[in-house]
Amino acid sequence: MFGLGGQELILILLIILLLFGAKKLPELAKGLGRGMKEFKKAQTEIEEEFNNAIEDTPAQKKETIKDKE
């Protein structure tokens, strides 16, 4: 996971705990979760819109001289 070992992750978590305090961690986690949920929702909507636009676009046909006659 990002090239971090167990000791590095524990150190990062301890620093976060010291900076924000134990009482604010659940609130921060909720906010992060909501943000990720909104991001994934927007990503899915954009992908669906893009796929629908591709499906709705008729394939362009190359005209040949025989087609014009």
Swiss-Prot record:
Keywords: Cell inner membrane, Cell membrane, Membrane, Protein transport, Translocation, Transmembrane, Transmembrane helix, Transport. GO terms for molecular function: protein transmembrane transporter activity. The chain crosses the membrane at residues 1-21. One of its GO terms (biological process) is protein transport by the Tat complex. It is a single-pass membrane protein. GO terms for cellular component: TAT protein transport complex. InterPro entries: TatA/B/E, TatA/E. Gene3D superfamilies: 1.20.5.3310. It is found in: Cell inner membrane. Its main location: membrane. The keyword Kinase does not apply. The keyword Phosphoprotein does not apply. NCBIfam families: tatAE (TIGR01411). Forms a complex with TatC. Belongs to the TatA/E family. PANTHER family: SEC-INDEPENDENT PROTEIN TRANSLOCASE PROTEIN TATA (PTHR42982:SF1). Part of the twin-arginine translocation (Tat) system that transports large folded proteins containing a characteristic twin-arginine motif in their signal peptide across membranes. TatA could form the protein-conducting channel of the Tat system. This is Sec-independent protein translocase protein TatA. It comes from Chlorobium phaeovibrioides (strain DSM 265 / 1930). The gene is tatA.
